[in-house]
Amino acid sequence: MKNNDGLKERTLNSVPEGTTCTIVKIQADDTDMENFLFSLGCFEGEEISVISRLEQNIIITIKEARYSIDSDLASAILIDG
């Protein structure tokens, strides 16, 4: 997927463990999901790191806090790539 600047965007689901990237957009299907991600600190320009992958969840850090999110939430986080 390319954004208006011609840069490639991908979701957090495609990021391997141990990678830090920058959020370029939150693209959620509903406002509850979007608001939840915002409450975690997921905003455009923020750095986000994938710490590990579990069977159904991804462990991330953002703003020095660690969270476990599912693949639906991860697919709503578009990162540089």
Put a short name on every predicted segment:
Residues M1-P16, L78-G81:
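Extended boundary segments
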Residues T11, F36-S39:
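Short, conserved secondary-structure segments in the cores of folded domains
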Residues P16, Q27, S52-L54:
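A generic structural motif
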Residues T20-M33:
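Short, structured beta-strand/loop micro-motifs enriched in basic residues and often containing a Trp
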Residues I23, I48-V50:
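Conserved hydrophobic positions within beta-strands
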Residues D32-F36, R53:
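Short alpha-helix capping/helix-loop boundary micro-motifs
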Residues F38-L40, I60-A74:
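Short, compositionally biased
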